[in-house]
Amino acid sequence: MSEHAQTLGSAVSTSTVSESRKVIFASSLGTVFEWYDFFLYGALAAVISKQFFAGVNDTTAFIFALMAFAAGFVVRPFGALVFGRLGDMIGRKYTFLVTIILMGVATFCVGLLPTYASIGIAAPIILIALRMLQGLALGGEYGGAATYVAEHAPAGKRGLHTSWIQSTATLGLLLSLLVVLACRYFTGDQFEVWGWRIPFLFSIVLLGISTWIRMSLHESPAFLKMKEEGKASKAPIRESFGKWENLKVVLIALFSINGGQAVTFYAAQFYVLFFLTQFLKMDPALANMLLIISVVIGAPFFIFFGWLSDKIGRKPVLMLGLLLATALYFPIFKGLAHYTNPAMDQASRQAPITVLADPATCTFQFDPVGKARFDSPCDKVKTFLVKQGLPYSSAAAPAGSPVQVSVGDVRIDGFDESALRAAVTLAGYPTSADVAQVNKVMVVVLIVVLLLIAAMCYGPLAALMVELFPTRIRYTSMSLPYHIGNGWFGGFLPTVSFALVVYTGDIFYGLWYPVVVTGVSLVVGMFCLKETRHVDIDNN
């Protein structure tokens, strides 16, 4: 009997335990590798800003680095369309084999890329192009892996089985942080010169292993059954988004599930790292170590909440996570500030910093295309304060008034960097978080709470998304809202939040972005999202 016939014969039955384990392991390992590749850039954003955006000031360079990071997210929905269509037409297995090769090659090339000092403006242009290739590949990876695992999972265990795919993003982040820390340790002062390239070059080894394992997989039984019955879609994109009954479900998935889930995930694993290092001035090595510890503690909960969704439903778990995110983000991040840099907290209470300026001279420093110039005295003052991690408030001055900075009782006219440094030093503002004063246990506890919230939203996600759509258009239909949510809502979280902080001076103001998104998702989900755990995905 042929392999095709053997697989087809089991299409309507559950997979064996050994086959299920192999499917989960092979799919998850490859997805861990893709997330490792994708997250490396985020872990090295500060270094990359110096290597590839050297022609601008430090704050603008960091914003550009975040924008390049976000560029990979922008194209993810397009990857979802391209590879989703292929996955629904030619099969799940071969499609997500292509995505892993594309991701691995693009990441390896980043490790070989000359810097701005070597080839000038071509360096950031090529970097962004490679980031976009990574995003294109990741746009096709998740839908393929989630669909493939779910279509092999026995009824009643889809949440548990697909939650392993959900945990891969966290494991990929953990792997990237561990590799970066190891490279920092072994290369020392040379890390920012050439050592940062090693994590990117190392990806070629992971690519070889992941590709070899995926080559041994068989096609999804549900897909083969559909093909044998002649029910495969000839135009999955048109069918997914051109028919209102399907488009309506896509929109519900985007606004009730993916938008909110995305910001909870990136708040817990990306924005928190930016917050600790950029605004609270924690030593990057310590911040990475505390995040690693938190991720190790939090990772199993992605599996737990996937399992729990098999017992009580997908919707209750997801809605609880969104509710907690909306209610707790401000208290959690204020707690991080208190336990990370108490000296900064005390100084800001005793000698608050106020920037008095004509609002027309102050720019909102969000520049997706890199053409704006932030060089007014107001912009320079705010850039300096944010670069130093100093919280401040803004006050409007009459039109045409020069900028004035107050540090407690000290007044400084215009942008005078020396005078500003002297004033903040006199007021007791620390230049960095004192490692001895960081309450490491409480920082880990608060990050773990963020991860638990993310796990509630992310753990049941793959099963829920697979169950919403029919087999013939499943890959395409679930991939697009997922990657719009994660690529746009989540991917721009660090950049938008950072720009909000620069504009207002309030290090917590950027949290309004995730709070609003999770709040909207909560309301839409409560009224529009249906429960799906009992759906028969083989026959819908």
Identify the residue ranges that each predicted region occupies:
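Cytoplasmic membrane-interface "Motif A"-like loop-to-helix N-cap segments
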Residues: 89-101, 311-322
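Hydrophobic core of transmembrane alpha-helices in multi-pass small-molecule transporters
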Residues: 113, 119-139, 343-357, 440-456
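Extracytoplasmic gate region of multi-pass secondary transporters
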Residues: 41-42, 246-295, 332-333, 360-395, ...
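Glycine-rich segments within core transmembrane alpha-helices of 12-TM secondary carriers
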Residues: 137, 159-184, 206, 332, ...
